[in-house]
Amino acid sequence: MIVDVSAIVFCKIRHNVRCYCLRFHRKAPFAVIATQNPVGSAGTQLLPQAQLDRFMVRLEMGYPDFESQVNILRDRQQDDPLTQVREVSSAEALLEMQRQAQSVHMADPLLEYVTRLTEATRAHPLVLLGVSPRGALAVCRMAKSRAFMHGRDYVLPEDVQSVFIDVCAHRLFLAPKAKISDTTAADVLTGLLKQVRRPDHI
């Protein structure tokens, strides 16, 4: 199936998509999940930086641990495990959790901390294109979600630090000399977390 990434991004932002003369409205909640093969890229093209910036977070899965691999094999001995999937939440409940998560308080010192971190990415000598304001907003949203998942109604500096790399690594466009020195986006961001002072008092 051929998928127009621009159309998916448009649908994500504008809540509708057009196909020929028809317009389809999407219902909330709506999320776009994409996979990327770390090895083969024949016949594919990298997403433009502007479209990568629309994805809130990128996770690197790697291989599952030994026990998980055994469970994968065990679960597929008889039936397809997908037949055992059950609904655990309604769309309405999920939307309410999203609303509650975004109502979590984030104090000004933390907003300034996020801004200092993202500005530092733009000034880094190994970075050609740093984290955008949209990326900074994504850091705030993810930090609030983490605080909510930990049962708090306020964000702590460790919430920001915990999500910073996963939210920002795919948004960095590194200079060629970064590849020469074998420096990754995660390396750059890890260094900035050590260099940029976190707020002492919230």
Would you name each region that the model predicts?
Residues 84-139:
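Conserved AAA+ ATPase small/helical "lid" subdomain
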Residues 14, 51, 73-77, 118, ...:
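Hydrophobic aliphatic residues
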Residues 1, 35, 55, 114, ...:
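Conserved RecA-like P-loop NTPase ATPase core
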Residues 18-104, 144-146:
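Canonical AAA+ ATPase core
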Residues 63-67, 71-74, 81-84, 102-106, ...:
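Non-catalytic accessory segments flanking P-loop/AAA+ NTPase cores
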Residues 123-202:
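C-terminal engagement/docking regions of AAA+ P-loop ATPases
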